[in-house]
């Protein structure tokens, strides 16, 4: 009688760590957006319109979701050059997103909407804190993309191990979805 080994569909420990980290990020942004809603009801709240450049940055980050997914696909197919190319394009789109966000901040400041100082108000402070925290997470993702990209060039690289790009893709899609949520929240609720 042959012994049958039952294999369970287990989640890789690194994926569990990632999910736990993403959960904590969700809680942080849920707290910030909840505080935003509460604070908005106060009399000193100043409503203002988001710069149109935030719409462009939203399109850019959505495109980056496509390119990171293509990187995963090419990695699983064992096509290293296209894989590296899609990683590079994703990183470039991430940098473009950050630059567009910065441009949006400069447009806000040009319209006398500032984070600190005599021109500051609660609405602007919340906007800047929420978007800057998101930008830091995008920056972390861009750094991770470059790390995975350069590791793929290493002689020790195992092309069959797609876990790094899968983890990266999960994080990147999360950051993209988080921005969509924040953009919709700030645009329609803000």
Please name every model-derived segment:
Residues 1-190:
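...captures the hydrophobic TM-helix bundle architecture rather than a specific catalytic motif
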């Amino acid at each position: 009688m042959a012994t049958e080994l039952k294999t369970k569909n287990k989640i890789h420990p690194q994926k569990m760590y990632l999910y736990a980290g993403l959960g904590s990020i969700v809680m942080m942004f849920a707290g910030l957006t909840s505080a935003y809603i509460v604070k908005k009801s106060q009399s000193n709240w100043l409503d203002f319109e988001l710069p149109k450049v935030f719409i462009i940055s939203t399109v850019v980050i959505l495109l980056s979701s496509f390119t990171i997914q293509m990187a995963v696909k090419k990695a699983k197919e064992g096509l290293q050059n296209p894989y590296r190319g899609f990683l590079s394009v994703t990183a470039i789109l991430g940098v473009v997103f950050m630059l567009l966000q910065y441009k949006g901040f400069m447009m806000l400041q040009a319209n006398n909407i500032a984070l600190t100082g005599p021109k500051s108000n609660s609405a602007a402070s919340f906007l800047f804190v929420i978007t800057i925290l998101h930008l830091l997470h995008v920056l972390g993702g861009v750094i991770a993309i470059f790390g995975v990209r350069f590791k793929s060039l290493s002689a020790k690289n195992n092309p069959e191990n797609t876990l790094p790009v899968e983890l990266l893709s999960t994080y990147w899609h999360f950051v993209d979805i988080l921005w969509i949520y924040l953009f919709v929240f700030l645009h329609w609720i803000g």
